[in-house]
Each structure stands twice: as C-alpha cells, then as structure tokens.
UniProtKB/Swiss-Prot annotation:
The gene is rnhA. Its EC number is 3.1.26.4. It is an enzyme of class 3 (hydrolase). This is Ribonuclease H. It comes from Syntrophus aciditrophicus (strain SB). It catalyses: Endonucleolytic cleavage to 5'-phosphomonoester. It holds the Pfam family RNase_H.
Amino acid sequence: MKATSKAKTHPPGATAAKDPQKQVIIYTDGACLGNPGPGGYGVVLLYGEHRKELSGGYRLTTNNRMEILAAIKGLEALKSACSVTLYSDSQYLVNAINKGWAQRWKANGWKRNAREKALNPDLWERLLELCSRHDITFVWVRGHANNKENERCDVLSKEAAGRADLKADPGYP
C-alpha cells in the first residue's frame, strides 16, 4: 500500500495565475551527515520530456532545513506559475504545509505556541512566498521504498552533503 498525504495548498490571500498547460512534478529530499552536521538537498524536476536535477548544501545545518530548502530550490527553478505536485519523504515539510502549521507559525510571529519559537522561519518564509505563486499539491512518500525519483533525490542530497567545498548556512545559528 502506498502511503500518501496530499492537499492543495495556498497561503491565505494567494492568487497566483496558473497556466494549466504547465504541469510540473518535483521530487525533493534533504540529508544531514550528523544532525546538525554537513547537509545537502536533492531535487528532481519533471516537465513533459524535460528533466532537471539540482543539489547543494551547507557545512553545518540540519536535516529539516535541507528538506525545506530542497522544496524551495525546486520551486525557485520554475520560470512561471505552474501546477505542481511536490513529493517529499519529510513529514515535517508536508505536514507543515498541508496542515497549515507554517502559515499559523507565521501569523503568530514565528511562534509554535506561547513558549516555543518555530524553527527555520527564514526558510518557511521563502517557501510560503513561493507557494503563493503556484498551484501546489504536497504529497508525502515513504522514503527508501523503491520510489525511483525519491531515491535519486536521496543520492543527490547525500552527495551534496559530502562535498568538501560547502559554505556556511546563513540561517543556521
């Protein structure tokens, strides 16, 4: 049985102009060698017969930051508003969008509740802004379950995390 969690998401007030001709599929993954530690992201974009792979990383970061950054980099690669299905094995990423957590954290001044700050507000801010430009469905896929594109993103993210030339993550303390 394939486990998925999917919901279309638009931050409140979003009015992105959509082109129904542009149906894009994005697979993302993030990895960290230690947590925190060197981290990387991997992205596979599919549009018709076109395929693009992206990867990168930072020398000290977290796995969750890399999961969010993978989604950001995938969406930033789109040149115009699209209908997007974004697949991720990160429940943190998918639930934060689909369940409205990220939007709620933003509305509450980047606080999860009265005592706790929301983590990664710099990345959530960027992701929410990108979500407002597209018609996006976030779908959770089980990691390491023989999903070809998810496995490719896993390889890309781990390779990126292992690079010797990684820079500092500007948003990580």
